[in-house]
Amino acid sequence: MKQQFNQNMDTNPILIPLDVPTSEKAIEIAKNLASHVGGFKVGLELFTYGGKDVVQEIKQFGKELFLDLKFHDIPNTVAKAVANATRLNVDWMTIHCSGGPEMVKAAENAAQETAASLGIKPPVVLGVTVLTSMNQEQLAATGVNDAIEDQVARLAEMTVSNGLRGLVCSPLELPRLKSILPDSIHLVTPGIRAKTDAMGDQKRTLGPKEAMDAGASRLVIGRPITAAPDPAQAAQNIFESLL
């Protein structure tokens, strides 16, 4: 049967974070879930073990690859890191919005120019606003006393005005961001939990269907799938709940 998608879906939006210590374990998870999800996220833990080789191995499954290293440094350093990441032909990558406008512009320019030189599609560089593991008290401890949603909106507008085509945000911020940003901006949301799921590190969460209905482009869903008794069935169940 042909799959039917809701108005915010043109593909399977589920991205699985491969937050495991070895390439072997990551490949095992990817092999089990590849037919049930839209892609996989390689973060710091796995990348510092397997490097570019594990990225290429995960890409063999033919799914989207999200390289989540959250670059945050001086503009020149970030530009060079983004250029190298673009050479891996990933679909998504992250930088921290708090690096400022010059860093943001340098990152987007590096992605576009490197992709053009290689004749490949440029990755979507996503700006990370406020980590979904943070609550209001933790944000204040960093010296930011504004409400989380105000800080997210401020960083989002700055980032988009300097060229980025996407953001990472909690699902709770989706309605506000959709109201202030162009429709073309991709919004990728971790912090996806059903009411019955353990929260883990996540503080600002929403269910998968609610997040898609609020305007998410992609859903990063970890433990509700990977820690389930049958991860493949859990992924399929969540996907079907979105249709």
Model features per residue range: what roles?
Residues M1-E28, S117-I120, L174-P182, L206, ...:
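N-terminal amphipathic alpha-helix/helix-capping segment at the start of soluble metabolic enzymes
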Residues N8-T11, T77-R165, S170-E173, I180-S184, ...:
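Conserved anion-binding
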Residues N12-L18, F40-V42, L65-L69, M93-I95, ...:
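Hydrophobic faces of well-ordered beta-strands that scaffold small-molecule active sites
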Residues P17-P21, G43-F47, H72-I74, S98, ...:
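Active-site beta-loop-alpha junctions enriched in small/polar residues
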Residues P21-L33, P75-N84, I148-M158, K203-E210:
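Short, acidic/polar
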Residues S35, F61, L88, N162, ...:
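Structural motif
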Residues L88-P101, G191-K195, D201-R204, P208-A234:
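Glycine-rich phosphate-binding active-site loops on the catalytic face of alpha/beta enzymes
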Residues V104-T114, M212, I225-L243:
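C-terminal helical cap(s) of enzyme catalytic domains, especially alpha/beta-barrels
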